[in-house]
């Protein structure tokens, strides 16, 4: 099957340059999250937990709901991009809205999770491990929130102007950003929660 090089998001030189710029940006993001992961993994073994063990605090059902919401949103985002490339604006809008709703579910549960930890006396200041934990998850959560706002602004623009060769590349870049955040979450789920549920200190 031949690859269609004339999809709506690939029809302008500016759009292609924006994609290249985004990949450079993602490289910096990998460096950021890589540093945060390295810090947390180091502090998992020998860091100060202040007596608040992850084996007692982490709740698998909550984490699974968050994981399902974010990973399924990656699937719905992919469907939205498929319809964007078919130039079916209404279907694209529908699936992007579903994606953003799932993103909001994720953010809502993360806020609930942080509030729950706070009620148990856990915050970034009590120990080195928890400081790295909140910085990593907070940074990821802020990125997800930024992605939601970014996508909403773009969808409003598309609703007003219609889907065209100028805003389609921007939507494609948003989708890449969203998939990147999902990949980061898979690492968080594995390295932070799965290990944390069986090991503290």
Curated annotation (Swiss-Prot):
Highest taxon, organism lineage: Bacteria
Any GO CC annotation of this UniProt entry: plasma membrane
GO MF term list: cytochrome-c oxidase activity
Reaction(s) the record says it catalyses: 2 a quinol + O2 = 2 a quinone + 2 H2O
Enzyme class: oxidoreductase
Signal peptide boundaries: none
Subcellular location as annotated: Cell membrane
Keywords: Cell membrane, Membrane, Oxidoreductase, Transmembrane, Transmembrane helix
Cysteine pairs bridged by disulfides in the record: none
Cross-referenced InterPro entries: Cyt_c/ubiquinol_Oxase_su3, Cyt_c_oxidase-like_su3, Cyt_c_oxidase_su3-like_sf, Cyt_c_oxidase_su3_a-hlx, QoxC, Ubiquinol_oxase_su3_dom
EC id: 1.10.3.-
A GO biological-process term: ATP synthesis coupled electron transport
Membrane topology designation: Multi-pass membrane protein
Transmembrane segments: 20-40, 62-82, 91-111, 133-153, 172-192
Main localization of the protein described in the UniProt heading: membrane
NCBIfam families cross-referenced by the UniProt entry: QoxC
Similarity comment: family membership: Belongs to the cytochrome c oxidase subunit 3 family.
Function per UniProt: Catalyzes quinol oxidation with the concomitant reduction of oxygen to water.
Protein name: Probable quinol oxidase subunit 3
